[in-house]
Amino acid sequence: MSRAAYLILENGTVFEGKAFGAEKETTGELVFTTAMTGYLETLTDPSYYGQVVIQTFPLIGNYGVIPADFESDSPSLKGYIVREWCQVPSNFRCEGDLDTFLKESGIPGIYGIDTRALTRIVREYGVLNCKISYSPDVTKEELDEIKNYVITEAVESTTIKEKEHFDAENGDLNVVLMDFGAKLNIGRELVKRGCNLTVVPAHTTADEIKAMNPDGVMLSNGPGDPSDNTEIIAELKKLCDFGIPTFGICLGHQLLALSQGAKTEKLKYGHRGANQPAKEVETGRVYITSQNHGYAVVSDSMPENGKVSFVNGNDNTCEGVNYTNMPAFSVQFHPEACGGPHDTAFLFDRFIELMKNNRK
């Protein structure tokens, strides 16, 4: 029989459920994702570093654990909240169950919670800090500790430590991927399009990248407050002066905008899920996209050289920027999907075209 577990919110609200995964207390930032599938990609997405994730879809774990679907080597999130988890998964690719995977990864989980009510609290009051505990009792000191929780050193904790290289079959373009907490599928999308890929740590300097003589630079997704990364932003500003074709995704999009003088802001509860609408400004066409971010570029803060290219269909926040003074563009959503729709995968082809045109 599962042990009782409690989710304690910073406002003192306590939800009771049952423990699964690793049994340990943890504190994190409480967020929700509306994705109906792709829970493995959610669990292994480095962008969830420091966060406790609620799955709004009620039944999770149906197809078990499939390592080929992972977006990183191991989870970075602090905790996992579901309504119900499937104890007998069924899939021809399945190599284990969710409970065992969370135990092996050191991630505590709670099931049996009313995730609908919990999500509505986050939607109404905004992102809250929380604690997974095994006692419903909480002292004022513990509540203060929960309230004061801050995600720190997010990029430093999720970036690779050493440079890695991957050759594409008949690859004729060389791309440097700056890893701020990159999802693996970004690299896969580039390699399958004929790009030889060099993945570098987040604090690689602009001069070091220039010395590699790349055809293009990809700025990856990643966790945390983008404005915390002052050294990286300064290097990106210098990198932009070199005129190398650049494509930014998610955190990479935000860091590129910050390097050009724009500002970012924290959203009330963020955009997380595989069903987020993004409207292309030029055409008015709406794409269904995969998103995972709690910050956004402030559209009105963009300099003259940055033109907003996509906006969110729900709240009209900035979802993309095209730059007129350099061969660069970026999007807030995830065109590599995994999990999610592939509607905007054409943006990788646009990047390929940009690199080839820059060669001429």
Language model regions located:
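RNA-binding accessory domains that recognize and position tRNA/RNA substrates
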Residues: 1-207, 211-212, 226, 338, ...
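Proline-centered loop/turn at the N-terminus of a beta-strand
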Residues: 108, 174, 245-247, 263, ...
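Active-site glycine-centered loops adjacent to acidic/histidine catalytic or metal-binding residues
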Residues: 114, 250, 293, 334
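Structural signature of beta-strand start/N-cap positions in the alpha/beta core
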Residues: 196, 245, 288, 327-329
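Active-site-proximal beta-strand elements of phosphoester/diester hydrolases
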Residues: 174-179, 289-290, 329-333
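Cysteine-nucleophile active-site neighborhood
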Residues: 211, 215-216, 220-288, 296, ...
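Short clusters of small/polar residues that mark proteolytic maturation junctions
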Residues: 19-20, 57, 291, 313, ...
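Catalytic beta-strand/loop cores that center a nucleophilic Ser/Cys/Thr
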Residues: 284-326
